[in-house]
Amino acid sequence: MDALKLLTTNVKFKNKVPQPSIKEKEAKKLQGITKGKAKVTGNNPVDPIEEFPEGILCENLKKQNITECTTIQRYAIPTIGSKRDLLACAPTGSGKTIAYLFPILQKLQLHVPGGYRAIIVAPTRELCEQIYRQAEKLSFGTSLKIIELSKSNEKIQEKAPKLREKYDMCIGTPMRLVQAIQTGLSFEKVEFFVMDEADRLFEPGFIEQTDHILSACTSSNICKSLFSATIPSRVEELAKVVTVDPIRIIVGLKDAATDSIDQRLLFVGSDTSKIVILRQMISNGELKPRVVIFVQDIERAKALYTELLFDEIHVGVIHGELPQAKREEALAKFRKGEIWVLIATDLLARGIDFHGVKMVINFDFPQSVHSYIHRIGRTGRAGNTGQAVTFFTKEDGEYIKLIAGVMRSSGCEVPNWVMALPKPSKEMKKKLKKSPPKRKRITTRASYDRQKEQRKKEYIKKVKKEASIKKHNEATGDSGQ
């Protein structure tokens, strides 16, 4: 790698075509998500539809200002409606949720007591909540009953198992669904089974739970659908095992981001420079709310949140250690615009839909191509445009080729010297995915100040402990001698 180029170049990738007018942009946005190319393979694929079938579901979509089918919806709706197993890969923000909810709700038609007839599995509580909200909107005015398995209603169902017969569709994370099965939940009447973010559900930590759930679906008439924005070859092989004669739909290029995102690589030198450069971007007015900033882990999320809080920025944070109520509160404030900048770990990278996210910043370099695609997919959704900026250090340089490949396949222009960089080996990619690099702490305070603050905290802790012991001794009459 040419170190001089890395040290002196901020690489910006723009679409090759001249910038069109605003009116042309709007037309192109709509055309991109509704008339995009799709590669369909499998035995006797079903013909695509051109518009949503008329009826109450279509009317409910119109209330959300959704009047045209996206590409994935044109192909997936008739496929699932014909009860064909499906493996679907489409860019983030292309309407995958409606692509499977619409045909399932249409086929279920009316509420039928006796147990769940449709199961939707998603890797995170936040994504399940989002799917549930869309299902409620779409089924409004029907007699269909939908439930999202969560901590709040789990105990109610355990105490009153017959309540389960009230619902037609169940949405939940693998853990929640496995727990429900263990308490007596039956999936024997399930007609439709959907895996959203299927590649994640086939990863270690989820695959055993996913297998448990699939084993509980014993109906011979079940239709299985797997959706994701990225589907690695390994996942395709596993999908063939759990599906029967599936139709495979790939919208656009496999493992590519949508072309509605302006992607940029920004060399920052070292980890310690990142916060300074981020503040420069803020002061230059480069950050247009709303912004999502991705970091490598929970500790770095907390640290960056503290730094930006001191700058009096409307900032929030979401990570796995936050209680569910706090996570939901942060997401709600971000949606309402009360929070302008949301700091997140990869917990937020998958599936969650925010309207109006203008920019994504990868403060820490993503650990895989799939992580990159899902992260930047929080912007440029539903035909809107967005920006994605990825910080990289000298240590990250050997992995740039991975990201550059995604950029080029997404229709962006990439300098030849970047494409000439060697590809990281399989071993290097596995190492990065398994164990992210150790990074220096996020702070602009001097080491002396940090040590001073730590000593102060330790002193306060010691004083409180001594006071507690003294109070206990006085209460028990123990002199401590």
From Swiss-Prot:
ATP binds at A90, P91, T92, G93, S94, G95, K96, T97. Residues 428-443 have a biased composition (Basic residues). It is an enzyme of class 3 (hydrolase). A motif (Q motif) lies at residues 65-73. It catalyses: ATP + H2O = ADP + phosphate + H(+). Keywords: ATP-binding, Helicase, Hydrolase, Nucleotide-binding, Nucleus, Ribosome biogenesis, RNA-binding, rRNA processing. One of its GO terms (biological process) is maturation of SSU-rRNA. It is found in: Nucleus, Nucleolus. Residues 77-249 form the Helicase ATP-binding domain. Residues 260-422 form the Helicase C-terminal domain. Residues 425-481 are annotated as: Disordered. GO terms for molecular function: ATP binding; ATP hydrolysis activity; RNA binding; RNA helicase activity. SMART domains: DEXDc (SM00487), HELICc (SM00490). CDD domains: DEADc_DDX52 (cd17957), SF2_C_DEAD (cd18787). Gene3D superfamilies: P-loop containing nucleotide triphosphate hydrolases. Residues 447-475 have a biased composition (Basic and acidic residues). The Q motif is unique to and characteristic of the DEAD box family of RNA helicases and controls ATP binding and hydrolysis. Interacts with the U3 snoRNA and is associated with the 90S and 40S pre-ribosomes. Belongs to the DEAD box helicase family. DDX52/ROK1 subfamily. This is ATP-dependent RNA helicase rok1. It comes from Schizosaccharomyces pombe (strain 972 / ATCC 24843). The gene is rok1.
